[in-house]
């Protein structure tokens, strides 16, 4: 991977209804309903709003068999009104629900942390190598019949790992670590490869964007080692609403998109689902502007570790560098020096002259040839 020059990671193509994912396809945008899945009419209407806003997949929670079976009615309701957007069933805890959902949805999301392994009790478990291998066989015994149902119905799957729902088995062996999240996913991917099931999308999510970014990067590295190129679904869990939710999603998803990673994204907001689509669209459109940019002859520092980056050591100058937090510099060359009280910059760059009326809590930067050392809280910019 070239960290200075953008190029999208090559991934395999996955068929999801009439909207394929990965390969040479565009980065897809999706959302998730927050309606009761047994309420067919409400689900259909909300799905339509998501689709009309630009959503290319619609995910619905399927807590039980009844909800999974009702996906058939929701699908019929949408198709009868001219919508052919694929539906995705979101399944937790019960493999039987996934078996049913695979017959009516174009894609089924399962969580490795609770698909076969029992619910978390936060106990430390000890395994011999043989016992650990037996636990993997239990996963195979339950997962392969599900894959066969998916093959029969041309249903894709997403193996979706969540930071907060790793099994006791994985937690005991790896701890609450990115490595544990990656291995939780890889266990299922190896079974898919062995069974020649290729319509697989993967995701690893966390509410902590630093953990999310590091773990997805690590997952891609591990897949490359084993010759896998499954497409990636990106998202930040519990991002929130308003500006905070949008900023948090942009940080996590945007950092990975900038790496060239990601084939579909969902911006998760605590708002109406259709509000997520424009935010996702902006992220994708921004990253597309980087395609074909002029070559940047950058070179990584010898000590830089892409999978576990650390802050470069610097000398502190005033409140910049060293152990200080990064500062925010605003540019005000057009002469407007008003600031939002909630979002004040640390410094304002004002070009060749400083304003007569200044905020004492903000430092000012001026061009070096216009700097007067007698001016308080004003510093030269060379």
Language-model segments: which ranges?
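Glycine-rich, proline-tolerant flexible connector loops at the mouths of alpha/beta enzymes
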Residues: 34, 54-78, 112-134, 200-209, ...
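Alpha-helix-loop-beta-strand connector modules within alpha/beta enzyme cores
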Residues: 65-89, 138-154, 219-228, 289, ...
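Catalytic alpha/beta core domains of metabolic enzymes, predominantly
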Residues: 126-143, 148, 170-321
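N-terminal active-site wall of soluble small-molecule enzyme domains
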Residues: 62-104, 335-338, 357, 374
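Hydrophobic or amphipathic alpha-helical targeting/insertion segments
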Residues: 84-123, 129-149, 154
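N-terminal amphipathic alpha-helix/helix-capping segment at the start of soluble metabolic enzymes
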Residues: 1-31, 147-153, 289-337, 376
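Active-site mouth loops of central-metabolism enzymes
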Residues: 7, 23-42, 61-63, 85-94, ...
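Hydrophobic faces of well-ordered beta-strands that scaffold small-molecule active sites
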Residues: 27-33, 56-60, 85-91, 108-110, ...
